[in-house]
Amino acid sequence: MRREFMKRFWKYVIGIVPAYGLFPLVFSFVFNCLVYSGSRAIAGGWYHHNIESNLDLRLPFVPQFLIIYFGCYVFWAVNYILVARQEREQVYRFFTADIISRCVCLIIFLAYPTTNTRPMIEGNGIWDLLAGWLYSIDAADNLFPSIHCLVSWFCFLGIKDQKRIPTWYKGVSFTLAVLVFLSTIFTKQHVLVDVAGGVILAQVCFILGQKTELWHIYERFGTKIEKKIKIGRAHV
């Protein structure tokens, strides 16, 4: 029964994401978590620079944007899966850019840790409770560049030239990315320069992935993992 379940499971997974796209997709998530939590574990007690501007201080706290801030994880999952369903070369070009961006984030998080000023949460309403919960589980660090903004912009860049993706969904993805940018500002999770840094880093890394041959390095490594996955599936 277990063998039959695993066969059905793999058939279902490969039906969503081709075998060559599975490793880069999963590793993207794993590496992102390692960068974010690892840099926090290393630099959590270090001095953090506050780079918020006067404009940041004047912008209001709008907790309703937490809907976008939390909901964007669904947006990320959907679009990264759409990217992983592309042709092999495009998959590795995109995820090469994705990995490079996280390497840059890790360097910046350790070389120049940043923080910001968060509002005092004193109410007992649903939005106050949600904001308080977010602040309690997500320390004000690893802010520049904003990974929320970086990933959201990647979500748009990764599908904008896909002919199989409807134009309306490309527009939706662009709109959602911009809403995520706004959510990071109005929930006081990030400041303006964090947003700009995330978008610029995503754009630069995406160009590197598309215009250089760096993807071959990642693709060779990914191919070895892909073969091991296929061998494992064959023995199920």
Which positions does each model-derived feature cover?
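Hydrophobic transmembrane alpha-helices
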Residues: F156-K160, A202-Q210
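Membrane-interface loops
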Residues: S39-N54, A84-W168, H216-R233
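Membrane-embedded alpha-helical segments of multi-pass membrane proteins
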Residues: V30, I68-F75, I147-V151, A196-I200
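Short hydrophobic alpha-helices at membrane interfaces in multi-pass membrane enzymes
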Residues: P166-V178
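Hydrophobic, membrane-inserted alpha-helices
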Residues: F75-N79, S152-L157, T175-S183
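N-terminal transmembrane-helix/juxtamembrane module of multi-pass inner/ER membrane proteins
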Residues: R2-W76, E122, A131, R233
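Aromatic-anchored segments of alpha-helical transmembrane domains
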Residues: C33-L34, R102-I108, T175-F186
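Interfacial helix-loop-helix junctions of multi-pass membrane proteins
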Residues: P119, G123, A140-F144, L179-I207
